[in-house]
């Protein structure tokens, strides 16, 4: 919004050229989202408390968590407000990637809000049924996947629909240009061609998978928000490189016109996340709930797809991956042993993985900070793929 205003008034005030610089707008988006979160946080927490939207705690979990019962949840609304305002103020609203990321983020946010609402109203920690949640995630994820298959392939906004129709007329057999290939980290100028169907399948898996992985990780005070901020900031760097014809050529990455604008979104997400951490750090005054976790995970997955860094997201988001795998392994092994031996057996003391460490004697704050440190190391490793190729 401010970019369009600056471009319109640029002839009358030369200092407005500052608003056309991507890095300046990214810094301002971070500050804007951070200030909004810090200022509005107490008010949002009071409102959530008045609405009696307290978190229900599993009785079979660590006993130290029982004191958290009643802590306001659905605080992810605060994050989404900061992201929305900062992105709309400082982003280029003609950029197609901004809008598709916003659609996925807030679409998944709505799913999470409904899930949280049911948990609060019906006092049921399970919320929406897994089938219902997965269905709506799939609707949004598939729409985004189909759209991105052609918008990543085409530099011109107008021709995205034309490209889609050309694919339909080809009998759904048309390929995609090289910039839509799956990039392999650490390998210079080597990528794997996906085709339209492969791109759609991978994109769907990344977006929906990232959303649920972040949601599973959100179980301790401050645990998930800092990894989201770190991974989001790292993806913002990739977006800046991919969106620049100069830097992408120098670093031997495909140039994706318009991708650089995602730095604004990632910066806004970082600022909003840090503001939320102010109130979510131990002992938490508010939890983000599914409204925040599902939305942020979907956002990370969508940005990773646009900048063609799906594998790097898998690396940098290693904590999310480990948490998800711990649940999958626990459930699978329990069902197998129950069928085989008549009683279910567990690999971990409790899943997701952070609860296993808690029950192993780690304090909550130890688990949280150590997971942060691991994520920081993984993000630095992921960023090294910019040059180590």
From Swiss-Prot:
Q: Which organism is it from?
A: Burkholderia pseudomallei (strain 1106a)
Q: Per the entry, which co-factors are needed? A: Mg(2+)
Query: What protein is this chain from?
Result: Phospho-N-acetylmuramoyl-pentapeptide-transferase
- Member of which family? Belongs to the glycosyltransferase 4 family. MraY subfamily.
User: What is any one of the record's Gene Ontology cellular component terms?
Assistant: plasma membrane
Q: Which reaction does it catalyse?
A: UDP-N-acetyl-alpha-D-muramoyl-L-alanyl-gamma-D-glutamyl-meso-2,6-diaminopimeloyl-D-alanyl-D-alanine + di-trans,octa-cis-undecaprenyl phosphate = di-trans,octa-cis-undecaprenyl diphospho-N-acetyl-alpha-D-muramoyl-L-alanyl-D-glutamyl-meso-2,6-diaminopimeloyl-D-alanyl-D-alanine + UMP
Q: Which GO molecular function annotations are given, in alphabetical order?
A: metal ion binding; phospho-N-acetylmuramoyl-pentapeptide-transferase activity; UDP-N-acetylmuramoyl-L-alanyl-D-glutamyl-meso-2,6-diaminopimelyl-D-alanyl-D-alanine:undecaprenyl-phosphate transferase activity
InterPro entries in the record: Glycosyl_transferase_4, PNAcMuramoyl-5peptid_Trfase, PNAcMuramoyl-5peptid_Trfase_CS
Functional pathway = Cell wall biogenesis; peptidoglycan biosynthesis
Q: How does it sit in the membrane?
A: Multi-pass membrane protein
